UniProtKB/Swiss-Prot annotation:
Example GO BP: tRNA modification
Cofactor note: Binds 2 [4Fe-4S] clusters per monomer.
Record-listed E.C. numbers: 1.17.99.6
Keyword Lyase: no
Name by which UniProt lists this protein: Epoxyqueuosine reductase
Source organism: Gloeobacter violaceus (strain ATCC 29082 / PCC 7421)
GO cellular component, one term: cytoplasm
GO terms, molecular function: 4 iron, 4 sulfur cluster binding; epoxyqueuosine reductase activity; metal ion binding
Broadest EC class assigned to this enzyme: oxidoreductase
Subcellular location: Cytoplasm
InterPro entries cross-referenced by the UniProt entry: 4Fe4S_Fe-S-bd, 4Fe4S_Fe_S_CS, QueG, QueG_DUF1730
Binding residues annotated for [4Fe-4S] cluster 1, in chain numbering: 182, 185, 188, 243
Catalysed transformations (reactions): epoxyqueuosine(34) in tRNA + AH2 = queuosine(34) in tRNA + A + H2O
Lineage: Bacteria, Bacillati, Cyanobacteriota, Cyanophyceae, Gloeobacterales
Amino acid sequence: MAPTAAQIKSRARALGFHKVGIARADALDGEAAERLGGWLAAGYAGEMRWMHDPRRRDIQQVLPGVRSVICVALSYNTAQGEPAPGQARISRYALGRDYHKVLGKPLKELARWIEASDPGCRAVAYVDTGPVQEKAWAEAAGLGWIGKNACLITLEYGSWVFLGEILTTLDLEANDPHPNYCGTCTRCLSACPTAALVEPAVVDARKCLAYHTIENRAPELPEAIAEHQHGWVVGCDLCQTCCPFNLRAERWGRYSEVADFAPRDPWNEITLDQLADLSDAEFERWSEGSAIRRVKASGLRRNARSALGASGDSLAQAH
């Protein structure tokens, strides 16, 4: 017997997800595809070729016959102190176990349960692994809203959440889209050191520290990026740490209880000097099961040396 929306949500929460919502497969009505097309046409994707996959604009091409999109969120925030002088700065999302692994296992389990409950249906899970506009679907499913920092912001956890989706051929009762509560706030726009937020909710990856420290494979970082690194070597959280909803979540003690997201040694206190001389063997050992592996050892060495050079000495000061 086909599971109901309520049963699926209950099962998702039992599997550990903090938020779950459902959107109809026609909920975006082409608006998201149009926005994505404009973003790509402006060149804002940089060298991220996979963003041009045409399936990203039409979910029916991802799963023919899809009728509902089940969206989940899992908080990953952990308490962070001020970085010490010379400490390498790593985005919070990368300090613990790779989120693809942490979310992927229970999400696939949920998809299998749905298909087992109704053998005639399809249910396919994605965790930042397919041509799916995750934030747009999460907003449509009522999990939160796309903020001016281009992150999905939730009332309970701010933007410190990982997202996952299950595309299914089941026709499920949908949630209402989440209202946007950013209002007149522009803190994130002002906080970005490279002006990568070219307008509210629009990131020009070519100007973004996170893009360059993770996705840019060039031997050297652009000077316009390096001079604003302030110790960042994997990602950048500046447009999130200033967000009132993230600050409120921290005041409320809304930190993730998921043990896999606890910062791992040595990443939570490694220095720029250490990373500048990182060996391939050390990287392979330390990055096992970590999203940092995407950056590669050569990328970390480049980023650390760039940050050290921009600081004027071996102690890059935090922003």
